Structures are given as C-alpha cells and as structure tokens.
Amino acid sequence: MSFSEKVLICDQVDAVLVDILKKNGLQVSYEPQITPDDLAKKIMDYEIVIVRSRTTITKELIQKTTKCKILARVGVGLDNIDTDAAKAKNIRVINAVEGAMNAVAELVIGRSEEHTSELQSL
C-alpha cells in the first residue's frame, strides 16, 4: 500500500521512522528544530504532524490546520497536544502507548535485583 500524504516531523526522531514513511510513499518534511512561529505558518500544509516532547500542539495551532488528519506523538503521553481541540476538528490523535514498555520493565527488574542484593547483605 502506498500513500501520498504530506508528513511534518517537528522533533528529532530515529532515521528509521523517516525511512519507513518515505518508503511507503509519504512526503516527509523533517524539521526537528522548527520554531513555534514557523510551525504556525506551515501546519496547514500537512495531513500528518509528528511530535515528541519538545513541540506543543496548541488549540491555536490546531485551528490553523486545514488538511490535518493525524497528530502523532512518538512517546507515551499526550500532554503536549490539545486533544480536545483536535477532536473538535475530527483530527485523530495517536501515540506510542507501549513505546517505553521494555525500558520500564528493564528498570524494574534492575532495581529489583539491586534491592535483593541489598537485602541479602543484611
């Protein structure tokens, strides 16, 4: 399947994501240092906008969108996207809910082993 939508990536992401999007026919603009002012001028030209935690998608930005279908967060939370404003414009908001699952599991296991060692030395 191939798509023709334009994608704006507003924050630094792994090159693999950019490659996958391009290989599927999406037109990708990778602007990891885009300023809020520049984003306000450009957001209306894109069907998909991808952010991490640096960029905040406000109600004012969402109101400027004319083509946007998806706001995507590469990460767990959605606190930097005004989800109510997106819903009001029928823009789908998605995130990587399970993105940190392995890292959290590794941390928990590591801390458990650390505390087990401490208990054994008592």
Residue spans for each PLM region:
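N-terminal glycine-/charge-rich "phosphate-binding" loop or analogous flexible N-terminal tail
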Residues: 1-46
